[in-house]
Design a protein with these regions (language model features):
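Absolute protein N-terminus
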Residues: 1, 21-22
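Bacterial N-terminal signal peptides that target proteins for export
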Residues: 1-7
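Cleavable N-terminal signal peptides
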Residues: 8-9, 19
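Extracytoplasmic metal-acquisition and chelation regions
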Residues: 22-292
Length: 292
């Protein structure tokens, strides 16, 4: 009799809503938005990044495994602004019918002329004020997808947004202390437009918004001349791009290495930029430090 009561009690526990609850399965297009979801979602979410750490979201090629991962998601979070050109065909191939959050919704985008076309700069997260917009969008999407834990998402989101605001203030103060004529650096590609607009830094690069673009010999020669004329003394490589071209330009112009930046891909957990906030602070410290 006692054994029967015990079996019934265990069965009731296993069938209870608490025991049956599962984490929200979220697929993120790349590591930056994936980390934001992890920070806000906490223990209630399982996040899979399609583009792995140190991976280039511009050149990513989805696999059948990615299609299967997407098909099992409860929510998909992407950057938008044209970053994930491969997304639509992946969604179609996977048969995913759920919600897709574009984390950049509400951002005032930047544009430039590239190869005779007007293109949108997708790297909005490199301004921390934009990062706050991303975070708010993610909070709302998680709360809608998993209303049972909405209060937790909003509490964790508020705390996270405070961190982002503090980092924005940190960056503003760091660059305000540097004379404007010194705020110039060379990078691999034009991923810092929003950062430049927010913090008053001038970035030079051989290629535009996408790492898939190629620089012509005329562009390279013109850039080398500009670097010399403007006395740009430091160049940076990026963890997700081929460094050879920017090193070639630096050698020809006399610019010295300032190290590595993380504008659109986080590192693995052992690296210096394993989270969005760590990557941003690293970039601020490295860039500002090179101008001293």
């Amino acid at each position: 009799m006692k054994r029967s009561v015990l079996v019934i009690a265990l069965s009731s526990l296993l069938l209870s809503p608490l025991a049956m609850a599962k984490d929200l399965q979220v697929v993120a297009s790349f590591s930056v938005v994936g980390d934001m979801v992890k920070q806000i979602g906490g223990d209630h979410v399982q996040v899979t990044d399609l583009v792995p750490p140190n991976g280039d979201p511009h050149e990513f090629e989805p696999t059948p495994k990615d299609s299967k991962t997407l098909a099992q998601a409860d929510l998909v979070v992407v950057n938008g602004l044209g970053l994930e050109g491969w997304l639509n065909r992946l969604v179609k191939a996977s048969g995913y019918k759920g919600s897709v959050l574009t984390a950049s919704n509400g951002i005032k985008s930047l544009k430039m002329e590239e190869d005779g076309k007007t293109v949108t700069d997708p790297h909005a997260w490199n301004s921390m004020k934009n990062g706050i917009v991303y975070a708010r969008n993610i909070v709302d999407a998680l709360a809608k997808a998993d209303p049972d834990h909405a209060a937790d998402y909003r509490k964790q989101g508020d705390s996270y947004i405070q961190q982002l605001q503090q980092l924005d203030d940190y960056a503003v103060k760091a660059f305000a202390a540097i004379p404007k004529e010194k705020r110039k650096v060379l990078t691999s590609h034009d991923a810092f437009g929003y950062f430049a607009a927010a913090y008053g830094v001038h970035f030079l690069s051989p290629i535009g918004y996408s790492t898939e673009a190629e620089a012509s010999s005329q562009t390279v020669a013109k850039l080398i001349k500009q670097i010399k004329q403007e006395h740009v003394k430091t160049y940076f490589i990026e963890n997700q791009t081929d460094p050879r071209l920017v090193k070639q330009i630096a050698d020809a112009s006399g610019a010295q290495s300032g190290g590595e930046l993380y504008p659109e891909a986080l590192t693995d957990s052992n690296g210096p930029a394993a989270t969005y906030t760590a990557a941003f602070k690293h970039n601020v410290d490295a860039i500002a430090g090179s101008m001293q």
